[in-house]
């Protein structure tokens, strides 16, 4: 396990992403604890729709680290990655005899944090 400098942790959040948090977590579990380069490769080649917003948030977190903290992207590791449930959009599907069934369209908030790996002495 790589030691991380959590004092220099930088994060990015995507809110109200129109996707189920369960499906996003399946992708986030694959990149948690990996280096930035590894995470990019994994996200590029995974066949899930959830990879697009996760990739966007990861790139944003690394850009924040580079611009705001002056950190090198090559040294960064995904220290935290989680998806919380957002509000569900409620829609109705007409059914027979004047009834209507509710359809829930879930949203989620994706958070990705990156931190520099500490050099081994």
UniProtKB/Swiss-Prot annotation:
Alphabetical GO biological process terms: translation
Descriptive protein name: Large ribosomal subunit protein uL22
CC terms in the record's Gene Ontology section: cytosolic large ribosomal subunit
Keyword match Ubl conjugation: no
Role this protein plays: This protein binds specifically to 23S rRNA; its binding is stimulated by other ribosomal proteins, e.g. L4, L17, and L20. It is important during the early stages of 50S assembly. It makes multiple contacts with different domains of the 23S rRNA in the assembled 50S subunit and ribosome. The globular domain of the protein is located near the polypeptide exit tunnel on the outside of the subunit, while an extended beta-hairpin is found that lines the wall of the exit tunnel in the center of the 70S ribosome.
Quaternary structure note: Part of the 50S ribosomal subunit.
Family: Belongs to the universal ribosomal protein uL22 family.
Database matches in PROSITE patterns: RIBOSOMAL_L22
Keyword Ribosomal protein: yes
GO-annotated molecular function: rRNA binding; structural constituent of ribosome
Keywords for the protein's UniProt record, in alphabetical order: Ribonucleoprotein, Ribosomal protein, RNA-binding, rRNA-binding
Pfam families: Ribosomal_L22 (PF00237)
